[in-house]
Amino acid sequence: MRVIGVRRALRFSPNNEEKDLAIMRAVVAPWNGEIILEEDPSLPELLTTATVVFSMARTSWALSCLDEAERLGVCVLNPPEGVRRCARSVLQRLAEASSVPVPPREGTAGWWLKRGDTAAQSRADVVFCPDRPALDRALADFRSRGIDDYLIQAHLPGDIVKFYGVLSTGFFRFFYPGDDGQSKFGDESHNGRPHHYAFSQYDLHAAASRLATAARCPIYGGDAIISPDGSFVLIDFNDWQLLPLPIGGRRGHTPVGLERGRINTQRLI
């Protein structure tokens, strides 16, 4: 069995490029897999030689290449269709249809303006707006950049929890990034240090699994906010997880919960 790992273009991993690579290395290592960047011109030819492809790719060109590989019988995880469904505006509709709790549009503590057509590539793609004038300015900036697909969500107080999992395997982990001050853009600071409010891990896992199923994205990660009463909302969801912790660190786990040298792709697709 030949296993290939496809890395995201670096612009899709702002401030986490090395951790992204570490995850992919750990995933393909049991099968001595080869890693290639999604923008590499040799990608189409290489994909035709694979049995299984673990892909973090997000560019339209790479996803089209992966579509063709799937058509030829290659198992691709995550499937390109699942990656397309991870656009924020699409996920919002899927979450609402799957009874997955997400933030309301209106609140009392400000707003988040988020680019809806793709994952954040810079700090300017996800903006905290403490008041209405700030929101209006952020919207004007989006329009000046040609961004007309966006989400507006109310800012909610509570603990930020990062989670990651793999459908159909029972593998699900979460942690509090505020415990270590780990952050991609520093946005977690708006929620302060975590209080570790009690909540149902089972319910969080179930909600994430419903969204992953709807998105056809078996290997996933995301963020949630836990309220003092134990309720939660999902504020972010991604194909794969961007793990802001050293692989093998004190919270280290095999990044996608795969046992060394064994894989059952039928359970993931």
Annotate each PLM feature.
Residues 5-104:
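Conserved N-proximal alpha/beta basic substrate-recognition cap immediately N-terminal to
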Residues 142, 151-157, 166-187:
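Catalytic core of tubulin tyrosine ligase-like
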Residues 58-60, 117-118, 240:
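Short glycine-rich anion-binding loops that position phosphate/pyrophosphate groups of nucleotides
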Residues 116, 155-156, 164, 223-225, ...:
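Anionic group-transfer/hydrolysis microenvironments
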Residues 3-10, 71, 80-160, 198, ...:
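Active-site nucleotide/adenylate-binding loops and adjacent lid/helix of ATP-dependent enzymes
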Residues 50-54, 114, 163-165, 230-245:
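A short beta-strand motif that forms the metal-chelation/ATP-contact edge
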Residues 183-234, 242, 254-269:
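A long amphipathic alpha-helix within ATP-dependent nucleotide-binding catalytic cores
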Residues 245-252:
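A short acidic/glycine-rich loop-to-helix N-cap element
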